[in-house]
């Protein structure tokens, strides 16, 4: 990547509560959780859920004013599962077009802010990070190192242009709702590998370098989320790359992160949908998870952020999953993408 890469822009949603939970029991926990939030009309502008060793970990965001209500519902429904709570903001950079070098540069920027816990989700249109409120201003300024954003030459230029837009942004978050959610289309691809990497915040810069190395091979990143870890100070990244006989992904990770715990799942498929919705929008994720459950699809990971939903599951289940999605969403087109290599 060039010293400074031109992107479309970035957005920040402030005044949010970031909640992280882990449920070691119950493979239907994400569906039960999403159903609970939807029944109470609690919007989730950011949600990731990932499975590992039969335990589900979720990162989610609610409006700051809904924090107490959300926590009360969680405790009442699921008991004492010790949710972690942070006041923060969602930073979304777009478009990154599934390019690992964009993810790598963002990891590098955020990793240099110190040993911080950060939640990530990507889609074909954007990569989003949930940050603690104490580092959001520093993170915003640091973006202008590796990236250029249209007419905004400096952080001050960008901040001036954002005045008065925060309320409009919040109105879009929770005002749009339909009986059958519409999306612009569904894309999917198989022949993917799902990698699980456990690392701490201090290793984010090195993980960024790993993604830049993936980019040098011309690889396309079709799925990426983070999930919380039971180990203090650690987190888990889950991401998909094309299946490859010549590229040893685990070896590339271990070269820079020898202490990182890495697991690979082969023969998975990823899907993505873009639409006019924002985040969960009062139940989109709930409807999707119920449909996938009825189709007996073994979801491995999911994200719902900004205008996109992405997910990953075993390749052999992708067709039944697509049928389930078409049953609960208005999907005008379904497109299979072949595993891509940019070189």
Residue ranges and their predicted role:
Residues 1-343:
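A conserved regulatory-domain signal marking ACT and ACT-like small-molecule sensing domains
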């Amino acid at each position: 990547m060039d010293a400074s890469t031109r992107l479309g822009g970035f957005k920040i949603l402030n005044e949010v509560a970031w909640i992280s939970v882990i449920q070691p029991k119950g493979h239907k926990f994400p569906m039960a959780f999403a159903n609970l939030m939807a029944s109470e009309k609690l919007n989730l502008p950011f949600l990731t859920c990932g499975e590992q060793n039969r335990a589900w970990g979720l990162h989610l965001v609610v409006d700051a004013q809904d924090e107490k209500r959300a926590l009360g519902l969680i405790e009442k429904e699921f008991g004492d599962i010790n949710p972690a709570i942070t006041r923060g903001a969602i930073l979304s950079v777009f478009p990154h077009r599934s390019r690992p070098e964009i993810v790598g540069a963002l990891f590098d920027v955020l990793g240099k802010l110190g040993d911080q816990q950060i939640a990530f989700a990507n889609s074909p249109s954007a990569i989003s990070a949930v940050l603690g409120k104490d580092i959001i201003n520093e993170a915003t300024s640091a973006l202008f190192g590796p990236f250029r954003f249209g007419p905004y030459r400096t952080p001050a230029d960008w901040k001036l242009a954002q005045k008065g837009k925060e309320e409009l942004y919040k109105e879009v978050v929770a005002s749009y709702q339909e009986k059958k959610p519409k999306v612009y289309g569904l894309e999917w691809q198989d022949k993917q590998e799902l990698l699980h990497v456990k690392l701490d915040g201090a290793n984010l810069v090195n993980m960024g370098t790993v993604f830049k190395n993936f980019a040098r091979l011309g690889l396309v990143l079709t799925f990426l989320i983070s999930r919380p870890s039971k180990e203090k100070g650690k987190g888990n990244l889950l991401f998909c790359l094309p299946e490859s006989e010549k590229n040893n992904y685990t070896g590339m990770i271990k070269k820079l992160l020898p202490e990182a715990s890495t697991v690979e799942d082969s023969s998975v498929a990823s899907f993505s949908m873009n639409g006019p919705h924002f985040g969960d929008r009062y139940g989109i994720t709930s409807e999707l998870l119920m449909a996938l459950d009825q189709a007996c699809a073994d979801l491995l990971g999911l994200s719902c952020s900004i205008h996109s939903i992405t997910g990953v599951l075993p390749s052999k289940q992708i067709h039944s999953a697509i049928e389930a999605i078409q049953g609960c969403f208005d999907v005008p087109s379904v497109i299979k993408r072949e595993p891509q290599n940019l070189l």
